Amino acid sequence: MVWTLLGVLANQIAAPESLNLTPQQRFFMVSVPILFGGIFRLALGLLVDRIGARPTGILAQLVVIAGLAAAWIIGLKNYEATLLMGMVLGVAGASFAVALPQAGRWYPPHMQGLVMGLAGAGNIGVVIDALLAPRLAAAYGWPAVFGFAIIPAVAVLAIYIIVSKEPPVKITPKKFGDYFRLFGEKDVHWFCFFYTVTFGGFVGLAYSLGMYFKDRFNLTPQQAGDLVALCTAIGALGRPLGGGISDRIGGIKSLHIYYSVACLALIAGGLIESLALNVAAFFIACGAFGMGNGSVFQLLPQRFGKELGLMTGLVGCGGGLGGFLLANMMGQSRQHTGSYLAGLFVFASLCILALIGLNFVKRRWRTTWGAVAAARI
């Protein structure tokens, strides 16, 4: 949940009485944790395959707790400090590179969609952040929120140390060069792109919608946070649902549906003037992206089961890049046109490109590795 703190606190951090940031600075600030969450997934994915998921998870959580303590005690006194904090929070976002292979390796192929979706439903922390952080900031000041965040971070670390176990599947440690070997396979490029759109869409909206709703409809930070919580809840809960549906009808067919729905919802969100209908459009978009995340990770273990740690890092890096792009496109659009429309339309066009990509690969996937997979693709 701490991964999204800068996003849900952005309205207070960027306020004239605080750091007085421009729209472009605001959206770049919130995109930094997304970008570094993707980059650090590469490192954590490599560590998972070399030293195991459990020690990697413990190490990552200790880094995050140290960063939260520094932000609380020392403070974030300028724009540059928020960017450094965003890099640290990226480690929290990279935790998916630990959780997904650690969970997935306990279960058979035909259950991967549901299992990976449930593991990825940790996105529900975004909802908790959006509901609580703006209210805590209003009551105690936004710097204090980083101190409050230490409490659940320490609690999660303690629970993880007590109950987590390494999966029974033994994985041969990979070298960093294996990333480059894998990246030479064209299917890796496709998975990275598909996840760039689904996860990038979800997390980009999770970080950006608070500022979007406040700017466009003149809401308070608390009101905007409530709407972000509503929209992101369906995305977080939709991930296991999307994975489960993909187990039944196949990930390729599912992604066709989710990309189409997300594209239309983003366009509608950019055009509709009514607050209620606007929220409904982004609720649908977040739900489609969340379910799409589950579908991508239903397919991934079928194709790259033995390299799941590495692939989780690579694909997660693509997802982080997508969120970074969406947040910055919205910021650039707002800065230079006074509207968010252009940024939303550009990302909607990526959904269309993803649909074209699916049509390009589906026959080959179904007749090659999909034909021998132990689950529907």
Region spans (language model):
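Symmetry-related core transmembrane helices of the 12-TM Major Facilitator Superfamily/SLC fold
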Residues: 144-161, 342-360
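Helix-loop-helix hairpin linking two adjacent transmembrane segments in secondary transporters
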Residues: 118-164
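C-terminal transmembrane helical hairpin of 12-TM major facilitator-type secondary transporters
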Residues: 249-296
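C-terminal ends and interior cores of transmembrane alpha-helices
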Residues: 62-76, 261-273
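Primarily marks hydrophobic transmembrane alpha-helices of the MFS/SLC 12-helix fold
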Residues: 54-57, 255
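Extracytoplasmic gate region of multi-pass secondary transporters
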Residues: 6-11, 186-240
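Cytoplasmic helix-loop-helix junction between adjacent transmembrane helices
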Residues: 85-122
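Central cavity-lining transmembrane alpha-helices of secondary-active solute carriers
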Residues: 31-45, 229-241
